[in-house]
Amino acid sequence: TYRREEDGDTDAENRNRVYRLSASYGRSDNPLRVGLGRQFAPSLAVVSLFDGIYAEYRKARWAAGGFYGTEPEPEDWTWSSDVRGFGGFFEYGNAPAALRRWAVTTGAVSSTEEGEVNRDFLFVQGRYDDRKLSGYLAQEIDVNRGWRKDAESGDSLTATSTFASLRYRFGDALAVRAGYDDRRSVRLYRDLITPETEFDDTYRQGVWAGVDGKAGRHLLWGVDARSSSGGPAGSADSYTGTLGAAGLTQLGLAARIRSTRYESDVTEGWLHALSVSSDLASWTRLEIHGGFRAESPLHPAIPEGDFAWFGLDWEAFFGRHWLLSLTADRNLGAHEDNDQYYATLSWRF
């Protein structure tokens, strides 16, 4: 439930329902895996969420598969048949039990919207991981036809959507990381949306670098800097520090604090977030989280954007097959008064 103050006297209330139902089949002694319903394709990260069927055949060093389905409505995530897509992939990687783990995936995806050309593209993904170094690279190349070729000045091929990340570990206590993201559009499906996740999504595009580490048995820390451009917020710079602790007490108490300073072309401000979680018993865990964002406009025409949020997240396992998750969140300030409630029930068989 979202309740927003449209003016000083009235409220406008919206109710949204998001569903996700899927079933999959796979066995450790069978190379075939099949999924049906609303799902992500594990080897087709470029596709994001879709409603349809996915199948893959995976051997020790290679895999191949494909999908066919439709895209959900972008605004309310209901089922829609407007955008239909299909595609396939081939993956080749390291031998089993190798110390250096790597894989290269290539494939093609084609989609139409109400029978007309939507998007056709080729893609390549690569990942590498060993004891010290890990990296990921994804590149898409649009194959333009019809109106898309005219929109791209007659070019048949256009390189789009580059994403790269690199991480190097200096032992267990220190690591450095860097990345680059110029993807034009990323459809993100989240079970829970908070001002913290919205902030990170808004400033997603750009380059970043950071360092993180571990002090002692329980303390975790991190610092990073990001320069964003091309996204909905325009050009912006942000600096983030995080501090956390895990494995405290016999109940597995954990805590995390995050603070971000940001400056864009139109606003500047701070974002602070805190979460604390603990096991209530061997089969259930509770998290309390919240935060505050203070934003000051750089132009008089833009209103101030101070607001806060807080909530609870409870998970419980029932037997070997059932997982229940309940979340309640409240956002207030900056002309908003929003309540969000989520319930998820999973059954593994």
Q: What feature does the model see in each segment?
A:
Residues 1-349:
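Gram-negative and organellar
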